[in-house]
Amino acid sequence: MAKMGSRKHLKTYKAPKTWPIHPKEDTWTVKPSAGSHSIENSLSLTLVIRDILKLADNSREAKRIINSGNVLVDGRVIKDYKFPVGFMDIIEIPKTGEVYRVLLDKKGRLQLNKIEENDSKLCKIVNKSTIKGGKIQVNLHDGKNVIIDENDYNVGDVIDLKVPDHEINEVFELKEGACVLITGGKHTGELGTVSEIIVNESSNPNTIIIENSAKDEFLTLKDYAFVVGEDAPAISLLEVNK
């Protein structure tokens, strides 16, 4: 008997809360394949084409569009209908000229935000290591990695990455005054400015104090802060994020 995790489809009522789908509209949806994003934090390309963008009436039509090479993710043609797209990924439909960035709304759901640019992506540094030759490899939140000569970047900083070439355009430091989008906890999807970073000496995770547009402050985990600009957003965001 096949394991539950190996099934290609998933009943919609069992889908993660991050998926913007309605159980009453469809019984089944397509699970994203294992990849750069976890199942909870990604959507299958079929779900995006059929359910969100409404470019297909059913899975068969969505697969045809995808298999024809009519969808790009981060500047690369993707023909895998189960391909996982997640936070900050750039989806492009060349035939319509439309480009979207995957973001989180305040309910923690993955949503598409229509944008103009298609060659710039924000990627958070989740860890780094020294490799052969003394160079530094920084590993990013979407599974990508970039090799740099100098150890100038810290975990938590965000790279403005040119796609698909993986060239670094700019780096946004996670520091006081930085503009951040919260990606977890009860403040998911909120935009704010870093007021203070609290480093705990114990095994407890580091925390961060954020000031929102109403000048109210809240405490959240440092890991939940995703820098989107130095003192203002460098990218377009969902209206609900602002």
From Swiss-Prot:
GO molecular function, one term: rRNA binding
Keyword field: Ribonucleoprotein, Ribosomal protein, RNA-binding, rRNA-binding
NCBIfam families membership: PRK04313.1 (NF003312)
Name of the protein described by the UniProt record: Small ribosomal subunit protein eS4
Coiled coil: none
Transmembrane segments: none
SMART domains for this protein: S4
Stretches assigned to the S4 RNA-binding domain: 43-106
Membership in a protein family: Belongs to the eukaryotic ribosomal protein eS4 family.
A cellular-component GO term for this protein: cytosolic small ribosomal subunit
GO terms, biological process: translation
Lineage: Archaea, Methanobacteriati, Methanobacteriota, Methanomada group, Methanobacteria
A Pfam family hit: RS4NT
Organism listed in the record: Methanobrevibacter smithii (strain ATCC 35061 / DSM 861 / OCM 144 / PS)
